[in-house]
């Protein structure tokens, strides 16, 4: 997760440390995975290097951290146990569940499924947020989590030159760069405005198209709040 995401989201002070915590799925595009490359990276990353985990746990002690919160990634659970502090897992899917659904293909990830599942089972406090992909017996189940809106939809419409009364649709690929080949066709839907984060390197307003860079001056939850519908990728389906 890039540093600017936290700068946009957290009002207080924080220290940002860049660290690879999981491989996930290597993607060629938002809609196409690279499974062979994913396997190569998993083979070099798992199981975790114990010396690496030890070094991170020592740094955790130096920083006087009292809790590790893990957003899907299981590495924090291992580090927390090594450091002797509690861990919290927040997820609506886990990587063992994702990899397990590929095992019947040429994606030979069975050994990673078992390894990661054992780690997830060791977490001190487990939270699942809707929409949940695989329900488990957890400590807390909750509604979807989101950042609070900061600017009204009316103000966003005015800033983006979107007329009152028209429908607005967002097209998003979850922050992964994509070349949209159909933007010209959307211009024919003149009664609908389309907001496309990542649709341009700079902000561009073209007829009914609002093309924004991936990291724009607009707070993403405000953009979503302005829309009547969102079209996006369905995760690792």
Predicted regions and their residues:
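Conserved nucleotide-sugar donor-interacting segment of glycosyltransferase catalytic cores
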Residues: 51, 55-117
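A nucleotide-sugar donor-handling region in carbohydrate enzymes
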Residues: 98-99, 104-178, 218
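Short, polar loop motifs at secondary-structure junctions
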Residues: 2-6, 72-75, 128-134, 175, ...
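Active-site regions of enzymes building and remodeling cell-envelope glycoconjugates
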Residues: 10-22, 85-87, 138-148, 189-195, ...
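Donor-nucleotide binding loops and adjacent catalytic segments primarily
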Residues: 153-229
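Conserved nucleotide-sugar phosphate-binding/catalytic loop shared by glycosyltransferases and other
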Residues: 2-49
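A donor-sugar binding/catalytic signature common to diverse glycosyltransferases
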Residues: 67-72, 89, 218-237
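Alpha-helix C-terminal capping/helix-to-coil transition sites in glycosyltransferase folds
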Residues: 62-64, 122, 225-226
């Amino acid at each position: 997760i890039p540093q600017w995401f936290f700068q946009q989201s957290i009002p207080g002070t924080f220290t940002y440390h860049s660290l690879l915590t999981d491989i996930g799925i290597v993607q060629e595009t938002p809609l196409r995975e690279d499974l062979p490359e994913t396997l190569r990276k998993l083979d070099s990353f798992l199981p975790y290097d114990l010396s690496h985990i030890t070094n991170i746990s020592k740094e955790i002690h130096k920083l006087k951290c009292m809790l590790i919160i893990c957003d899907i990634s299981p590495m924090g659970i291992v580090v927390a146990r090594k450091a002797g502090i509690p861990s919290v897992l927040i997820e609506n899917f886990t990587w063992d569940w994702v990899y397990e659904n590929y095992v019947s293909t040429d994606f030979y990830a069975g050994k990673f499924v078992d390894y990661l599942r054992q780690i997830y089972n060791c977490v001190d406090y487990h939270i699942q947020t809707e929409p949940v992909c695989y329900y488990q017996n957890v400590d807390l189940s909750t509604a979807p989590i989101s950042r609070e809106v900061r600017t009204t939809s009316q103000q966003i419409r005015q800033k983006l030159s979107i007329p009152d009364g028209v429908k607005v649709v967002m097209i998003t690929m979850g922050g992964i760069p994509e070349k949209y080949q159909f933007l010209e066709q959307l211009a024919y839907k003149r009664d609908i405005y389309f907001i496309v984060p990542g649709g341009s390197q700079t902000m561009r307003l073209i007829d009914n198209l609002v093309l924004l860079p991936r990291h724009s001056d607009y707070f993403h939850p405000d953009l979503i709040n302005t829309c009547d519908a969102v079209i996006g990728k369905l995760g690792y389906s």
